[in-house]
């Protein structure tokens, strides 16, 4: 919706500071506004004002054209999206956008790793768990650039096990 994504702090923390609430409360408020419709009391916040406008515009366009188009060009027809309303459509498009963008990134990551000793162990909607071969640590910077090519900031964590991960500065490989 045109709001910048903070690079050094979580979006939820940025909004928590804006709301004057805790991080946990911020997540609840944010998800309620994004998935349940923006409540009047939050329309003064630029992000939510833009989200509300985007929901209305998307809903009008969906009803006018009879379909909605995903970022990669898939057309989802009204006939196939039963019992739809404006907020459900917005949620659906958030999920579709996230999935499509992640599939593009995942494809690039898999191509990047193709001729390497490093391997992907696990992928979730917001994380890649990689087993990086010790001779290929220098490739982390290129991998970070590849992933961030879609405009989303990336954090890198290293550890000997999933439960012992530490954030690192990719430039210096120092623990943050």
Roles of regions detected by a PLM:
Residues 1-86:
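Helical catalytic core of nucleic-acid polymerases
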Residues 11-12, 112, 119-121, 142-143:
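Non-catalytic terminal/accessory segments
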Residues 30, 119-133:
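Catalytic palm active-site di-aspartate
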Residues 34-35, 107-114, 129, 133:
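Hydrophobic alpha-helix feature that most strongly marks membrane-spanning transmembrane helices
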Residues 88-98, 131-134:
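Short, contiguous acidic/charged loop-to-helix segments that flank catalytic cores in large enzymes
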Residues 94-114:
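Short amphipathic alpha-helix segments
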Residues 111-118, 148-152:
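Short secondary-structure junctions
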Residues 134-176:
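Polymerase palm active-site segment centered on the conserved acidic dipeptide of motif C
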